[in-house]
């Protein structure tokens, strides 16, 4: 099923930058739609480190990833926006003075402005080379720390590099 939506701004990414874009656009009276591949608003702040303190937000000594996203959501409450989760933008093309963007769920957006706030992109864990690793998900294998209490006073093993 194809759905057509006209909006002032299409924002790709519903993390902190996408949410702040809603705020700035809202101050100008513009209507926004956000599209995100994740199943919830907040990007990496929610997906990877909801309980981890963040120290480099201007004017905020520290707050967790969840607190940061909650603050941004509170800030944009008065504004006109809609969120489309579990979708990605598969195609963008220019049509006259507008942009046409199509999502994986069959939504077609017509807009004058597209703001790409995709950050580091969609979080895709590198799964261990064992048979059916997802059957152990939450039972010994986790791809992100969503609650530090789950691991408190326990021995853990971390496999990986980079941000692991």
Regions found by a protein language model. Name each.
Residues 27-29, 50-52, 131-134:
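Glycine-rich, phosphate-binding/catalytic loops in enzymes
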Residues 38-41, 122:
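Helix N-cap at the beta1-alpha1 junction of Rossmann-like dinucleotide-binding domains, i.e.
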Residues 54-59, 125, 152-153:
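A short acidic, helix-capping loop that chelates divalent metal ions and anchors anionic groups
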């Amino acid at each position: 099923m194809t759905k057509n939506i006209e909006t002032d701004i299409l924002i790709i990414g519903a993390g902190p930058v996408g949410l702040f874009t809603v705020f700035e656009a809202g101050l100008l009276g513009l209507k926004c739609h956000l599209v995100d591949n994740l199943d919830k608003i907040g990007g990496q702040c929610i997906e990877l480190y909801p309980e981890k303190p963040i120290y480099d937000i201007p004017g905020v000594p520290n707050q967790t990833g969840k607190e940061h996203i909650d603050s941004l959501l509170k800030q944009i409450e008065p504004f006109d926006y809609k969120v489309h989760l579990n979708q990605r933008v598969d195609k963008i093309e220019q049509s006259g003075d507008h942009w046409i963007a199509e999502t994986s769920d069959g939504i077609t957006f017509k807009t004058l402005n597209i703001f790409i706030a995709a950050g580091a992109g969609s979080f895709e864990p590198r799964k261990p080379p064992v048979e059916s690793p997802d059957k152990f998900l939450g039972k010994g294998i986790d791809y992100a720390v969503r609650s530090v209490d789950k691991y408190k006073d326990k021995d853990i093993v971390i496999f990986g590099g980079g941000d692991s």
